[in-house]
Every structure is written in C-alpha cells, then in structure tokens.
C-alpha cells in the first residue's frame, strides 16, 4: 500500500491554483478516487486531504454508530457536511475552496505534508510552528524527556 510521505513547498499560480505534488498524485491514482477529498483538520489549523483511504477511514468511524443518534448526526456533519471533493485538473492542479483557505490561514503558497493515509495542506507560517511541536513530541516519544548524549536535534 502506498502512503503520502514527505513535505513539499508548493507555489500557487495567477489563477489561485496549486499543483498537487507528483508523489501525492501517484498515491491518489493508486487509490482510484475521483477528485481530491478535502476537509478542515480537526484542530482547524490545516486542510486534511486525500482519496479513498481518508474517505473510508472517516466512514468507518460512523459505521459502528446508530444512524439515528446525535453522535452520528454530529460526526457525519463534521466529516461530510464540512468536506468537499475538489476537481483535480489533468495537469494535477486544484483550486482549494476559499473557506478552507481562510480557515487554514492560507494566502498564496502552501506546504503539503504527508501523513500516511492522508496529507495536510498548511500555510507556511502555521506549519513552521506545528513542525517544531511535532519534532519535539517525536523526540520525547523516542528518547523520553531527555535527549541521549551526542544525539543531534
């Protein structure tokens, strides 16, 4: 199974379109998903994006719930009512919905970050802050609260 990996700085064109990184397009193609499934990230800092695996993962969260329950109603609104399937041009470009860009504080260039079954689209400033948190958390998980002697940060 292919995964979304790596980080890419992407430029927008004069029409506000951005190219999905080629490596990510290949994963989307392998998933046989038409378009790009986009949803605000749970913390509201970025845009979650992907194909069939992201869509299926969210659907599986609902599958065990009573479809008449309030929990199902709330989650289905968050997962599907707040999402959009964005058209991917044959050249691999997309125009992200304005509401998603505003929510993620994206104004122009974007950072695409692989997350395995999905990827995220960030504003460069927000991602720089988040990246530092992620790396600090990874160091804590790998080495505990203390970094081993001689380790590079």
Label every model-predicted segment.
Residues 1-3, 29, 76-78:
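Short loop/turn motifs at secondary-structure junctions and domain boundaries
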Residues 5-18, 22-42, 46:
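A positional/architectural concept
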Residues 48-85:
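Helix-adjacent hinge/juxtasegments
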Residues 134-153:
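Acidic/histidine-enriched, glycine/proline-rich intrinsically disordered or flexible terminal extensions
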């Amino acid at each position: 199974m292919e995964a979304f990996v790596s980080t890419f700085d992407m430029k927008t064109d004069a029409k506000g379109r951005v190219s999905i990184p080629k490596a990510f397009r290949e994963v989307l193609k392998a998933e046989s998903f038409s378009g790009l499934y986009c949803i605000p990230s749970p913390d509201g800092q970025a845009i979650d994006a992907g194909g069939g695996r992201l869509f299926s993962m969210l659907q599986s969260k609902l599958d065990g719930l009573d479809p008449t329950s309030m929990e199902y109603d709330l989650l289905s609104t968050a997962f599907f009512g707040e999402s959009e399937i964005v058209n991917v041009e044959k050249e691999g470009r997309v125009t992200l919905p304005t509401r998603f860009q505003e929510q993620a504080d994206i104004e122009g260039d974007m950072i695409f970050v692989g997350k395995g079954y999905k990827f995220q689209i960030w504003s460069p400033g927000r991602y720089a802050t988040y990246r530092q948190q992620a790396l600090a958390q990874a160091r804590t998980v790998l080495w505990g609260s203390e970094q081993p002697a001689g380790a590079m940060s």
